[in-house]
Amino acid sequence: MAFQLTPLRVALVAGEPSGDLLGASLLGGLHARLPASSRYYGIGGPRMSAVEFDAHWPMEKLAVRGYVEALKHIPEILRIRGELKRQLFAEPPDAFVGIDAPDFNFGLEQALRGAGIPTIHFVCPSIWAWRGGRIKKIVKAVDHMLCLFPFEPELLEKAGVAATFVGHPLADEIPLEPDTHGARIALGLPGGGPVIAVLPGSRRSEIELIGPTFFDAMELMQQREPGVRFVVPAATPALRALLQPLVDAHPSLSVTLTEGRAQVAMTAADAILVKSGTVTLEAALLKKPMVISYKVPWLTGQIMRRQGYLPYVGLPNILAGRFVVPELLQHFATPDALADATLTQLRDDANRRALADIFTDMHLALRQNTAQRAAEAVAHVIDSRKPR
């Protein structure tokens, strides 16, 4: 390609941990594909920073979930976007890659595209599930979409948006056969009774809303299944500090609280109770039975319900096109209901085997060498815009 010997500048913006994972994967591919002296900068997290990315702002500044919750953060978010836009206009990159975070990135991408800067968006918003009107924003903002799921490019191309299915880096990273025994050894949980991983979210607001309910459900599960053990991974030291009082308030629970190591915790588990999000896909790739749940403030929930198209919210169910694991959302997410559903997932061996087959098929479909495919797509966009 024309730029083989020319250093490039690629700006990227990720707004939450799942985007940081995707960004790190893409950066790995770009380092292998583009000239060694190329520069990568913008907004990202620790995974991206670990692969020679210059984070001008930490992604935590953008990690706000929900309509109502975002209102108080709007001034700072707009200030950051304005400063970043001025930087990118002053020194235009060869390409801009927005990684998820559509509410932040689409407006920025539209402005950059209008200035002649190639725009790529990594992660197609779930227009097939809710807020389908966003396709109009995509058409205005995005030159090329990198899609995690195989059915997405056709939807975008019908609207006139170029798109490439690149798979999911988690499917490349996670082995087809999880090492449950090795994970238990790593966590200090060899032998003993069954293990349930409990993941109440990766944001303070999520844990504050659903954490107490999850811990009450754990108390009920231990009463109904003596010998059961729990492992709760906290995404950050701050979230571990937030979870510790919940552990202290339930002294009879057999619970291991870890910092990070969510994948190890899920690998060690016989079943998982998990807040809806990308982590549910990770649980599926680990072939684990699970119960998916969430709670959001009432107004946010009403808006989401009115704008939704599908009867399910969890990625395993969306990818399967049907309910393969239970979902207990909002007022249905009671401690008693969560305990019953999770113990059913734990005890039903026939269901466990059926889920393993379903999740293996998903795994194989998403295992596409995402880093290489995504980097090739970005390189193609850059090359197509270079003067000949």
Curated annotation (Swiss-Prot):
<protein>
    <recommendedName>
        <fullName>Lipid-A-disaccharide synthase</fullName>
        <ecNumber>2.4.1.182</ecNumber>
    </recommendedName>
</protein>
<keyword id="KW-0443">Lipid metabolism</keyword>
<comment type="function">
    <text>Condensation of UDP-2,3-diacylglucosamine and 2,3-diacylglucosamine-1-phosphate to form lipid A disaccharide, a precursor of lipid A, a phosphorylated glycolipid that anchors the lipopolysaccharide to the outer membrane of the cell.</text>
</comment>
<dbReference type="GO" id="GO:0016020">
    <property type="term" value="C:membrane"/>
</dbReference>
<dbReference type="GO" id="GO:0008915">
    <property type="term" value="F:lipid-A-disaccharide synthase activity"/>
</dbReference>
<keyword id="KW-0444">Lipid biosynthesis</keyword>
<dbReference type="Pfam" id="PF02684">
    <property type="entry name" value="LpxB"/>
</dbReference>
<keyword id="KW-0328">Glycosyltransferase</keyword>
<dbReference type="GO" id="GO:0005543">
    <property type="term" value="F:phospholipid binding"/>
</dbReference>
<dbReference type="InterPro" id="IPR003835">
    <property type="entry name" value="Glyco_trans_19"/>
</dbReference>
<keyword id="KW-0808">Transferase</keyword>
<keyword id="KW-0441">Lipid A biosynthesis</keyword>
<dbReference type="GO" id="GO:0009245">
    <property type="term" value="P:lipid A biosynthetic process"/>
</dbReference>
<comment type="pathway">
    <text>Bacterial outer membrane biogenesis; LPS lipid A biosynthesis.</text>
</comment>
<comment type="similarity">
    <text>Belongs to the LpxB family.</text>
</comment>
